[in-house]
């Protein structure tokens, strides 16, 4: 069995950041207050990730299905995204964090795709953490788009993995807020991910919670569909 440190080397962690609205409701606050608190949680978790051996952190910020939410809430989320890009890019670059946004950009409000491109260019040299934020993202749509690009002749498991996985398969997938579903997030990339569900709402999720999730991951025995050597010997 690998040591916890070895198993955390270059870890790709992904988080479904759920519970902002319920966090706000429990405090008698509007949903927007929960989303604003959620941005602060992003900052804390991204800062803590490298020390825990996480090389890539993918965060589910806005799904393609989230366009169905009330226009006022969607507008607030887009303003938060714009403010995050404007206010955090320089700090991310200084800290060695490379920012990448995945998902569709052609439906985002005017100016945001350009702000994303500027932030990605400004942080491109970052080698401490690869921070990926999923916006207007659907894993099923991403798989279909990749298959269309590859075409019948180019379609294979390896080619699809290369087209989708970018920094590699997800090792640890965390969902906050108590729900236990994947919600169309990284379905191909998380095929063998270890799942960690927590009741904690996203705005309350911090460095200690991330460390606990990584410790839980490190204690697991990942077999990727096979058997451990002792079991193979016993079965022979």
Predicted regions: what is each one?
Residues 1-236:
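Flexible, compositionally biased loop and terminal segments
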């Amino acid at each position: 069995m690998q040591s916890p440190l070895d198993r955390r080397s270059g870890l790709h962690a992904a988080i479904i950041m759920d519970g902002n609205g319920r966090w706000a409701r429990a405090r008698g606050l509007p949903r927007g207050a929960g989303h604003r608190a959620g941005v602060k949680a992003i900052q804390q978790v991204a800062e803590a990730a490298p020390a825990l051996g996480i090389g890539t952190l993918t965060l589910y910020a806005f799904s393609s299905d989230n366009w169905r939410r009330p226009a006022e809430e969607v507008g607030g989320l887009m303003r938060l995204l714009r403010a995050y890009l404007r206010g955090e890019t320089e700090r991310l670059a200084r800290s060695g964090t490379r920012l990448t946004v995945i998902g569709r950009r052609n439906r985002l409000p005017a100016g945001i795709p350009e702000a994303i491109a500027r932030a990605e260019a400004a942080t491109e040299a970052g080698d401490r953490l690869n921070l990926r934020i999923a916006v207007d993202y659907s894993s099923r749509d991403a798989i279909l788009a990749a298959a269309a690009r590859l075409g019948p002749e180019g379609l294979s498991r390896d080619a699809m993995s290369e087209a989708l996985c970018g920094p590699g398969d997800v090792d640890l997938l965390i969902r906050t807020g108590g729900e236990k579903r994947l919600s169309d997030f990284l379905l191909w990339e998380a095929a063998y991910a270890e799942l960690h569900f927590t009741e904690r709402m996203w705005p309350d999720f911090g460095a200690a919670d991330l460390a606990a999730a990584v410790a839980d991951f490190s204690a697991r025995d990942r077999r990727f569909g096979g058997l451990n050597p002792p079991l193979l010997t016993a079965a022979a």
